[in-house]
């Protein structure tokens, strides 16, 4: 019965908040949340996600929310975040920055869609300043130990976006523009070519979402030089 589950979920959320500042796990697969989150029929967005875990319903990403967004299963996240309007204000601001960097470099909308897909899969546009998976940080979950830059550079969303796109940046890794023939590749495959994830098939699930997000936020996103 739900009356017996809420206290357990609240304790789970509090514990998750403490974990966000702890050392990263020793494996690439993030630990799943302790129990599935029940969802009210038709409920979407960050507030619904927080409510399902017994968190304060603020519509903003606090420490506990960030941890659970990182570990919740994709099937659950696709339900809560079915449309760009389901993202919170901070998440949308980061998405506009990703778009703005692409616009500032006069990159195509397709390049911007691919960057949005990668960030949505990796972080749901949460700028992680404490590592959850190994030393992965920022909206693209880039790793200092893998040559993506310093923690300060990776958690600076414009710099992280430039690294993903392959624009001049502190990164020693190839970005989108360095992937030969990326324009003719499937968008999810381009994400994987840049990110080199242990789960290469997960990017494609966000393609429609990313296209809708670009249509919603792109017109108001200022170019970022």
Predicted regions and their residues:
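Export/targeting segments at the very N-terminus of extracytoplasmic proteins
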Residues: 76-120, 124, 220
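Acidic helix-start/capping segments at beta-turn-to-alpha-helix junctions
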Residues: 61-68, 114-122, 135-139
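Short acidic, glycine/serine/threonine-rich helix-capping segments at coil-helix boundaries
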Residues: 29-71
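Extracytoplasmic/secreted envelope proteins and their assembly/folding machinery
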Residues: 43-46, 66, 92-99, 112-115, ...
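Secretory targeting and sorting signals
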Residues: 1-30
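Sec-exported extracytoplasmic/periplasmic mature domains
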Residues: 51-55, 70-74, 103-107, 120-124, ...
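Solvent-exposed, acidic/flexible segments
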Residues: 39-43, 58-62, 84-95, 107-111, ...
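Peptidoglycan-targeting cell-wall enzymes and recognition modules
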Residues: 77-89, 123-187, 193-196
């Amino acid at each position: 019965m739900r009356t017996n589950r809420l206290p357990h979920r609240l304790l789970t959320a509090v514990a998750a908040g403490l974990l966000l500042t702890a050392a990263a796990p020793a494996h690439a697969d993030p630990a799943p949340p302790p129990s599935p989150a029940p969802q009210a029929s038709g409920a979407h967005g960050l507030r619904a996600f927080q409510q399902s875990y017994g968190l304060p319903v603020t519509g903003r990403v606090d420490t506990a929310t960030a941890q659970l967004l990182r570990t919740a299963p994709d099937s659950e996240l696709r339900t809560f975040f079915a449309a760009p309007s389901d993202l919170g204000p901070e998440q949308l601001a980061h998405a506009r920055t990703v778009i703005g960097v692409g616009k500032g470099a006069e990159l195509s909308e397709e390049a911007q869609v691919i960057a949005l897909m990668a960030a949505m899969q990796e972080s749901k546009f949460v700028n992680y300043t404490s590592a959850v998976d190994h030393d992965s940080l920022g909206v693209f979950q880039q790793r200092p130990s893998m040559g993506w830059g310093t923690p300060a550079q990776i958690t600076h969303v414009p710099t992280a976006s430039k690294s993903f796109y392959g624009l001049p940046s502190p990164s020693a890794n190839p970005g989108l523009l360095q992937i030969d023939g990326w324009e003719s590749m499937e968008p999810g495959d381009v994400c994987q070519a840049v990110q080199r994830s242990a789960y290469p098939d997960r990017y494609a699930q966000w393609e429609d979402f990313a296209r809708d997000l670009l249509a919603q936020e792109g017109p108001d996103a200022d170019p970022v030089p």
